[in-house]
């Protein structure tokens, strides 16, 4: 897509200039944030996630509304150090996690995220941030746009991230939804996050003192990220 193709509201985590944060700003923030988001499925991460959920759940209902999630992302995780588009990113993550969680359970609370979906939401936010760092690395000329050659050179990194591509040109053209010959961050992130969640995303399966213990046990979740992408 062209520079004009991306929706300003969806400019989540665009590069310096569009986002108001520079590549250097994001790199520094990412080193802290990647450790602050407890998205893994080991015992320590589960314990941290339970505690974080309780901190987010200011009303003590065992369910999080969007405002509670956004407030927690600002006040507790301080994710705004990475991007000036945090509300857009959190809204996407909130909706995605809620929808996927409801699909797994067969039921779900409308406009609320329960503990079962909490890990999904954290994974989605983490993935968007990780994608931004990756896009910074792939976009070698700093044009805010990804060209086919840059995309081809990044295939090994994409494979590490969980997306194995055999026909780079065909996939690139699929991502380039308006056929402009270049890919914006929004086009790239929408494609890549969907691919990654299909491969790796799954809800939490532990109980947190409520009634969430019937969650899916679909796998071990998102693999360890490449730190500097």
Swiss-Prot record:
GO terms for molecular function: calcium ion binding. Keywords: Calcium, Cell projection, Cilium, Flagellum, Metal-binding, Repeat. Coiled coil: none annotated. Ca(2+) 1 binds at residues 57, 59, 61, 63, 68. Pfam families: EF-hand_7 (PF13499), FCaBP_EF-hand (PF22592). Ca(2+) 2 binds at residues 139, 141, 143, 150. Residues 1-25, 202-229 are annotated as: Disordered. It is found in: Cell projection, Cilium, Flagellum. Residues 44-79, 80-115, 126-161, 163-198 form the EF-hand domain. Ca(2+) 3 binds at residues 176, 178, 180, 187. PROSITE patterns: EF_HAND_1 (PS00018), EF_HAND_2 (PS50222). Residues 210-221 have a biased composition (Low complexity). InterPro entries: Calflagin-bd, EF-hand-dom_pair, EF_Hand_1_Ca_BS, EF_hand_dom, FCABP_EF-hand. Residues 16-25 have a biased composition (Basic and acidic residues). One of its GO terms (biological process) is calcium ion transport. GO terms for cellular component: cilium; cytoplasm; motile cilium. Transmembrane segments: none annotated. This protein has four EF-hand domains, three of which may be functional calcium-binding sites. Belongs to the calflagin family. May contribute to the rapid motility of the trypanosomes, playing a role either in flagellar structure or in calcium metabolism. Could alternate between a GDP-bound inactive form to a calcium/GTP-bound active form. This is Flagellar calcium-binding protein TB-1.7G.
């Amino acid at each position: 897509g062209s520079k004009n193709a991306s929706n300003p509201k969806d400019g989540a985590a665009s590069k310096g200039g569009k986002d108001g944060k520079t590549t250097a700003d994001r790199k520094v923030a990412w080193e802290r944030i990647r450790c602050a988001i407890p998205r893994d499925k080991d015992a320590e991460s589960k314990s941290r996630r339970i505690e974080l959920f309780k901190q987010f759940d200011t009303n003590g209902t065992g369910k999080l509304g969007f405002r509670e999630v956004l407030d927690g992302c600002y006040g507790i995780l301080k994710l705004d150090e990475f991007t000036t588009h945090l509300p857009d990113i959190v809204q996407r993550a909130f909706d995605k996690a809620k929808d996927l969680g409801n699909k797994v359970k067969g039921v779900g609370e409308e406009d609320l995220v329960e503990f079962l979906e909490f890990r999904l939401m954290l994974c989605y936010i983490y993935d968007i941030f990780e994608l931004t760092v990756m896009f910074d690395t792939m976009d070698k000329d700093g044009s805010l746009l990804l060209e086919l050659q840059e995309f081809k050179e990044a295939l090994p990194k994409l494979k590490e991230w969980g997306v194995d591509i055999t026909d780079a040109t065909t996939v690139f053209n699929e991502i380039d939804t308006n056929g402009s010959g270049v890919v914006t961050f929004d086009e790239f992130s929408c494609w890549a996050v969907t691919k990654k969640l299909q491969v790796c995303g799954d809800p939490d399966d532990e109980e947190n003192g409520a009634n969430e213990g019937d969650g899916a046990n679909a796998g071990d979740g998102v693999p360890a990220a490449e730190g500097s992408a």
